[in-house]
Structures are given as structure tokens and as C-alpha cells.
């Protein structure tokens, strides 16, 4: 409820033509979130607006409004549109429009316009003559007759072929292109659908071995990268000749030439050019046609464009010991009600180094050493949280660094709601940025790999269902081999039971067809996979764990559909034995 109250105070509601006309009388800048009644205002930017309102502190000249397009005649062109639209009204004139929840672009626009208003009020500049933009209808927009600032980006798609993925070449490609300045929006290992392979490789469809190529691409694990480029130009240092001598009238001398480094601006290589230069084109193919890439993204990653437009982010959250011990469940309810998805969570006692990092903003306070002692001797609770604009939203939700500051400026923050008497500090922590969140999540939830196997009796349809379940559970499919498990191969996977009397029956079942051997990666992967797999006997699994894979796909205790390593040590040994065979680089 606290969240809803903050939103009402932050943004005025305009849901009629009369209220729209009144809103245009606002002095200064009004930022208008145009929304449809069926989907509501854009929540992704509300924490940004809250931050701008607090930091700019310009209540007289900065206003935020939500306007329902369905009931306002002026906004008729925006009806039945699902993408967020933000209008900027300056003293009653609509001067700019931003399509999509592009927080950085909105942030820059607001700050620029408010800075101008301040200078105008102070007499430091004349008021610019802005042209009011037309609110055209959908037909005009379709034919490109309107100019507006858009959140759209152009992407390249790269596919690293299955043999190269087995050789871990995808890791090399990712590191190199990121170092070169390309932005990896998505990296995912997956089995490509046939329609994607045919669409991506239309340029070689007339080759005689194309059908064999399609089969190889749809049976192996490829790595797909969606890549964008921040800047089309790059500044490089080059050594150019320069002369030291000055010309004197009537004197002809051979000038002394020296070479000096000069910074020059050059056009950055395209992704394809960079791949060619790095000799990676043999195993990594690139598509740069924007229309085709957009179509392929819709097939492979249907949620990607929505997540980009709504700025879905993952952040690290930490609950201090007093909260963890006494009020964790209440906080988890708030987290759920605020629209966060909890991806991972764990209880942990922080090391001194971790505690000093989390409490760094208090390091100059007298109570700092006592605070560190408290943090390192009691359990804290860490979570990976995801939602629209997650990093900023969590920071705003928890409030400032001290209880005193929170009471003054954020009385509805978690800092105030769950204030503790032991220390004057905020009992919550959040990542400072997206980059910091990635590092902190990797630290507190380090990825782990486990060995997984789908047995021969599982049908192709069931196999694809299992792979879908694996993806939905948050596992990364790191490596995969389809293998006929001979006794030699099976011994590498089942080495712990090779001496058992029933092992010959295991070998018989495995010899009936092709098995799918996989490396699955996520935090706590071994335990998570064993939980998903369920009890060894499918009949027991149906009673104790009816949603487990063995309960759904197992036939009997030998044909129980799937297998997994018992512990991390066993998983590491099997992975080393199975996936480095013939691959000395691994």
C-alpha cells in the first residue's frame, strides 16, 4: 500500500479532456506518461521520476502526470498502442516525445529541460523557440512521417556452431567482442529450431550439402549472441609524421621529421569485420540485416523486446542480521507486493571483507567497527531480485543510509518501516548499479556445474519438454553431447556403481539408443538438479515428488528418464572425463 501512495503523490492522474486542458496550464516542464486503460501506467520509470523529483527539487517547474489515452480526445493517436509513450509539455506546448521506457534518454531530456528553465528564470539565457510536435495518427507513423526519439536499437545476431561450443570457443568469442566494445545483450546456448537455421542460412540454401548442415545444426548445441554496438566510431592512437623546423625566408633546409602519437577518430569495425579480422568466421556466423534479426529474436527470445522496453533488471538485496532474524518474512511479503521476482536467496554469515563492502558508506562513523562485528557474527539474508528498473527501484524502496535521513526524506521507505535500535543505519543494502549488481550476484551466488543425462527411452517430444523445464528452472545449458553410451562411456558416468550386481542391467538400458549428456550451470546446480530429478524409483517419485522429472517421464527404476551427479566432486570428475575426450583445449 505504501508504494501506491507514493505513486499517487508523484504523478497526477489525468483521465478526461478537461483535466488534460487544465494540465497544459502547468508552469514549467510536465512529463506525461500516456497509457492505455487495459495495461495501466509504465511502472518501469516511476523510481526514475521519484529520483528526479527528489534530486532536482523543483516542484514549481517539474510535474509528472499519467494520462489515460482512452478518455482524452487529444491523445486519440495513441489509443490501442502497447508500447509506452512519454510526452514533454513545456509551458503548455508538447515539444518532445519518447517512445519506449528508455530511462537514460528520459533522464537526459528532463535534466536538460530543467537546466534550461533554471537559466531562463535566472536571466542567463533567452527562452528557445520550441516547435510544438504534432500528435499524428497511426497511419502517419507507419509511413515514417513523424520524427521522435526512440528507444529502438539495431542488433546483430551471431551463431557459434555446435562443434565450436564443445571446444568452448563461445567463451573466447564472448570475451573478445566484449573487449572490443560490443554489447552482448543476450548469450544463450540452445538447440536451434529448424526454421531458425533455414532462415539464418538462406544465403547457402542452394549448396548441395545444405540439408546435412541443417541436421547437424539442429541436433547440436549452438551459442546464440544478440549484440549491439554503443558507438559507431572509436578513438585510436596513431603515429603520424611531424616536422620540427620552422620555415625561414630564403633558407631551404631539409626538415627534421619526427613521428608523434596523435588521437584520431575512426569508424569502428562491424561485428562481421571484427570476426573476419580475428579469424573467428569459420565457426561463428553473423547476421546484420535488421529485419531478419528482429524476426529471429521474436522466435528465439520472444520476451527480449518487452524486457528491453521495460528495462527489466536484476539487483542484489541484503537484509542485515536484525531483519534476517526477526522480520524476514514480513520483508519478503513487501518484496513480493512490490513486483519483484526472487531468483535466488540464501542465508549467510558475511566475511569481514564482505561486511566492509556492504557497510562502506559508514566507514567514517564511530560505530563502524561495532557494525562490522555485528555483521560478521550473525546471519544476513541475500537475494537476487528482478523487476522493471530493479536496481533503482530497490534503492528507492529501502531509502537513505541512515534512519534519521530516511525519516526526513523517505518516511515510507523500508529503512523507516523496519528501523532497528541497535544501529542508526539502514538495515538493507542494494547494488549501486547494473554492473555492480552483476559482480555482487556472481559473488554471493557463484555458478556451479553439474552432470545431467536424459536416457534413451525418453521420446523426442519428452526430451524437448525436459529441456524446456531445465531452461525455465534457470539452468544454463553449458555443454551437450548426444551419445550412444557404450560400456566404456557409461563407466565414466556411472563409475561409482560399476561393481554392483545390477550394473549390467543399467548398461543394457543405456545401449538401447542415444542418450543426451549435458552440463548444466547455475548457483547450487547439483542440489537443484537432484531436486528436479526426484527419487530413483518413478513410483516413489509420484508419491513423494509428483512434479519431478522421474515422476513425469520415468517408466521403472532402470528406465527412470534422467540421471544426475550426487555431489560436486562427482560432477566435476564426470564432466572432465566425458567432455574433454578428444578436446585437449578443454
From Swiss-Prot:
One of its GO terms (molecular function) is microtubule binding. Residues 10-116 form the Thioredoxin domain. Disulfide bonds join 39-42. Residues 453-586 are annotated as: NDK 3. PROSITE patterns: NDPK_LIKE, THIOREDOXIN_1. One of its GO terms (cellular component) is sperm principal piece. Residues 157-254 are annotated as: NDK 1. Disruption phenotype: Deficient mice display normal reproductive system phenotype. Residues 312-452 are annotated as: NDK 2. Gene3D superfamilies: Glutaredoxin (3.40.30.10), Nucleoside diphosphate kinase-like domain (3.30.70.141). Testis-specific. Expressed mainly in round spermatids. GO terms for biological process: cell differentiation; cellular response to reactive oxygen species; cilium assembly; flagellated sperm motility; spermatogenesis. The keyword Chloroplast does not apply. Its EC number is 3.1.-.-. Its main location: cytoplasm. It is an enzyme of class 3 (hydrolase). Contains 3 inactive NDK domains that do not possess all residues considered to be crucial for the NDPK activity. Probably required during the final stages of sperm tail maturation in the testis and/or epididymis, where extensive disulfide bonding of fibrous sheath (FS) proteins occurs. In vitro, it has neither nucleoside diphosphate kinase (NDPK) activity nor reducing activity on disulfide bonds. Exhibits a 3'-5' exonuclease activity with a preference for single-stranded DNA, suggesting roles in DNA proofreading and repair. This is Thioredoxin domain-containing protein 3. It comes from Mus musculus (Mouse). The gene is Nme8.
